[in-house]
Design a protein with these regions (language model features):
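Short, isolated positions in well-ordered beta-strands
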Residues: 34, 39-41, 78-79, 214, ...
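Anionic, Ser/Thr-rich low-complexity intrinsically disordered regions
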Residues: 4-52, 97-120, 125-127, 145-170
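Hydrophobic alpha-helical membrane-spanning segments
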Residues: 6-22, 32, 76-80, 86, ...
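A eukaryote-biased signal for long
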Residues: 123-256
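Polyanion-binding and phosphate-handling cores
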Residues: 56-146
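Amphipathic, interaction-prone secondary-structure segments
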Residues: 45-85, 181, 187-200, 204
Length: 256
């Protein structure tokens, strides 16, 4: 069963928090509920609040109310992907800062965009290369039980996912995006598909820093609706920019 009630008109008023459910699309399959929400770019107030909370400037395009969530209905266990938590997992030191010719100028332009940080902006990974792999909400389970349901030594059954089973539910959601002051692109997005017996969710951090590096960090979540089993897999790959002939940020379901 699928319900759809997206806010789609460009001039439609931004919903009050109490009305966020009206912009949420859900699908129930067996014991699981899958939810996605897509709303316009966050406004100044929420951006200032988030900047103060996480301690770094946020990207130019942040969709703070967007989310993707997979919930086990009997227990309330949920694995959720949202922009605030994804940005909070960005490195807030200078240990992994990538350098480009205009990095200092770019940082200076971001300092004045928020009211949440009064002092000079602290060092941080301005490429927004988050290590985020989702937010766990245990529901009725203990923290240990919840973690075990999302992390396992078992691998995602690739062969089953290659089958051309009918797709019952599909969606794509962007959580944040930055053009890095015309030095490339950094984007965190999610893409999911649901079949009768299983589903796959791919959340991807894609970074292209022109003439420097290409980086991909993927979190794949596989759900078996017959066994109630959830497998989460995190992978990270990167290569020098000149070694990559063609790159696209768009998530795919390939397992190369």
């Amino acid at each position: 069963m699928t319900t759809r009630n997206h806010v789609t008109a460009l001039d439609e008023p931004f919903p009050h928090p109490s009305a966020l459910s009206s912009a949420t699309k859900t699908h129930t399959q067996s014991n699981f509920r899958i939810a996605t929400r897509k709303l316009p770019i966050s406004k100044a107030g929420p951006i200032d609040d988030l900047t103060a909370r996480i301690g770094i400037p946020v990207p130019e395009m942040i969709f703070g109310d967007n989310l993707v969530a997979v919930s086990h209905i009997p227990t309330g266990w949920t694995l959720e992907f949202n922009a605030p938590d994804a940005l909070d997992a960005v490195d807030k030191t200078d240990k992994h800062v990538l350098k480009v010719a205009y990095a200092r100028d770019w940082e200076s332009t971001r300092e004045g965009t928020t009211k949440g940080i009064k002092e000079v902006v602290k060092p941080y990974d301005w490429s927004y290369s988050t290590t985020y792999d989702g937010t766990l909400r245990p529901g009725k389970l203990s923290a240990e039980e919840a973690a075990l349901k999302a992390t396992t030594e078992k691998q995602i059954p690739i062969e089953l996912l290659k089958r051309r089973d009918p797709i019952l539910f599909f969606d794509e959601v962007v959580l944040y995006e930055s053009e890095l002051d015309d030095n490339g692109i950094s984007i965190y997005s999610a893409k999911l598909r649901v079949h009768e017996k299983r589903m796959l969710l791919l959340c991807r951090l894609f970074l292209r820093l022109d003439n420097v590096i290409v980086r991909i960090r993927d979190t794949r979540v596989y759900v078996d609706f017959e066994t109630n089993e959830v497998i989460r897999e995190y992978t990270a790959k990167e290569a020098p920019f000149q070694d990559v002939h063609y790159v696209s940020w768009r998530p795919s379901f390939c397992f190369d």
